[in-house]
């Protein structure tokens, strides 16, 4: 077992920009790069291993070959690979949308529902996003406002700043606004129900599909209760600062702001995913120098469970998002 640098598939949705290509090194033939799927075993876009014995094979193929123990004991409760991690560049507004919970999604769509979190990497001045409702409404009012295009009168629009954290529980109405760059950690699902899309058309020249009936069945009609900040306070450790961004039954996410070095322990409990969002760093272990990795801005790696201890060392300051399963 060894740390694996991953190559991310990219998506060219109509609302995307160019920052992921220009600033984060994502390779795509499209003019727009809306999303890069940094950690994915989903059928709609799979991470490919870039180094070592499994170079050129998908992460899913590696897991199938080596067995689910590489995911760790804490992943034993999941039937499928549990998470999907993305970088999202919203040059334009995303649709107003909602994701179903596990029970509904598994029954209707044949895959997990989607609870997710957003870590705001950057935001234009005045940027905002839609996060639930201002106040509780009835299901009848919800359906009527969708019908007469007045839904946005009762939605909760929140100013967005770099470093904000939004926990989007399944069933929460939401929309990322234009001018926002986000790291998204979510359940392994690509099920989205669009409710409102500003009258836009897709590449085929036709209005993009809406999913009103399903959205009405799964949307929570009460305001969100989570604060829009990290779940924990910054904790100073030797060489770096660690902040718990969010933790739930599906994922735990921390921000590492590294001055000199950070220690990463890949225990038997869970794999670890590291995503560099600023700067660069060397990932190394004293006992396997051949598996040393250089990770630059926008690059990520998968460390199998039980791989041991690693040192993450930047030439200068470096910011990393670390995800694992508890």
Feature locations, PLM:
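Ligand-binding loop in jelly-roll beta-barrel domains
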Residues: 78-80, 88-93, 102, 112, ...
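His/acidic/aromatic-lined binding-pocket segments of jelly-roll/cupin-type domains
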Residues: 85-86, 94, 116-119, 157-158, ...
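Double-stranded beta-helix
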Residues: 130-153, 183-223, 316-326
């Amino acid at each position: 077992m060894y740390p694996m640098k991953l190559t991310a598939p990219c998506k060219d949705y109509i609302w995307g920009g160019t920052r992921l290509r220009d600033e984060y090194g994502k390779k795509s033939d499209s003019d727009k790069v809306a999303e890069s799927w940094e950690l994915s075993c989903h059928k709609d876009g799979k991470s490919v291993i870039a180094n070592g014995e499994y170079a050129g094979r998908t992460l899913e193929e590696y897991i199938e070959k080596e067995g689910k123990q590489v995911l760790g004991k804490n992943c034993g409760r999941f039937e499928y690979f549990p998470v999907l991690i993305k970088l999202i560049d919203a040059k334009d507004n995303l649709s107003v949308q909602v994701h179903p919970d596990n029970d509904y999604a598994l029954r209707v769509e044949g895959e997990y529902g989607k609870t997710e979190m957003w870590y705001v990497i950057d935001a234009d001045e005045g940027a905002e996003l839609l996060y639930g409702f201002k106040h509780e409404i009835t299901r009848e009012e919800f359906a009527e406002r969708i019908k007469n295009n007045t839904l946005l009168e009762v939605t909760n629009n929140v100013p967005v700043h770099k470093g904000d954290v939004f926990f989007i529980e399944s069933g929460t109405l939401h929309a990322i606004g234009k001018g926002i760059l986000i790291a998204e950690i979510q359940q392994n699902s690509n099920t989205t129900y669009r409710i409102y899309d500003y009258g836009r058309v897709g590449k085929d020249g036709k209005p993009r599909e809406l999913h009103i009936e399903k959205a009405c069945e799964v949307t929570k009609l009460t305001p969100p209760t989570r604060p829009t900040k990290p779940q924990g306070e910054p904790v100073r450790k030797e060489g770096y600062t660690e902040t718990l961004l969010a933790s739930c039954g599906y994922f735990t996410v921390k921000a590492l702001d590294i001055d000199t070095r950070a220690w990463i322990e890949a225990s038997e409990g869970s794999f670890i995913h590291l995503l560099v969002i600023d700067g660069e760093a060397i990932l190394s272990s004293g006992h396997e120098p051949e598996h040393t990795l250089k990770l630059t801005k926008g690059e990520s790696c998968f460390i199998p469970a039980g791989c041991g201890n690693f040192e993450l060392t930047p030439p200068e300051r470096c910011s990393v998002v670390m995800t694992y399963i508890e």
